[in-house]
Amino acid sequence: MPLSQEESTLIERATATINSIPISEDYSVASAALSSDGRIFTGVNVYHFTGGPCAELVVLGTAAAAAAGNLTCIVAIGNENRGILSPCGRCRQVLLDLHPGIKAVVKDSDGQPTAVGIRELLPSGYMNRA
């Protein structure tokens, strides 16, 4: 299914974000998310040998700090023209827990961008809440 204009805009914003910073091992992925009120939030990962947040988690914090409410779609873009990256397992779980209705833009089996529900990416996620 083709992406909506909003979903395509997320790709553009995340791509612009990662391309605006110098190439670095410490900041190698950007993410953009759309809130239900139409705002777009961006962020980049922070790599550190002790662990660090993925770009998606940085965006979740940025959106929460801005009282964004529900996020409806998210995408991650790798630096050095790596393009769309699928959320890692930890990000999938956090997205499911905090925004169970969110879609993530990923590549389909033909390498084309598509937006899928987080439950499709993590159908049997751990349920920490009753």
Swiss-Prot record:
Record's subunit section: Homotetramer.
Database matches in SUPFAM superfamilies: Cytidine deaminase-like
Occurrences of domain CMP/dCMP-type deaminase (ranges): 1-129
The organism of origin for this protein: Aspergillus terreus (strain NIH 2624 / FGSC A1156)
Cited InterPro entries: APOBEC/CMP_deaminase_Zn-bd, CMP_dCMP_dom, Cyt/Deoxycyt_deaminase, Cytidine_deaminase-like
Binding annotation for substrate: 28, 82, 126
Entry EC number(s): 3.5.4.23
Cross-referenced PROSITE patterns: CYT_DCMP_DEAMINASES_1, CYT_DCMP_DEAMINASES_2
Protein name in UniProt: Blasticidin-S deaminase
UniProt record similarity statement: Belongs to the cytidine and deoxycytidylate deaminase family.
GO biological process, alphabetically ordered: cytidine deamination; response to antibiotic
Stored Gene3D superfamilies: Cytidine Deaminase, domain 2
Tree of life domain: Eukaryota
Entry GO CC: cytosol
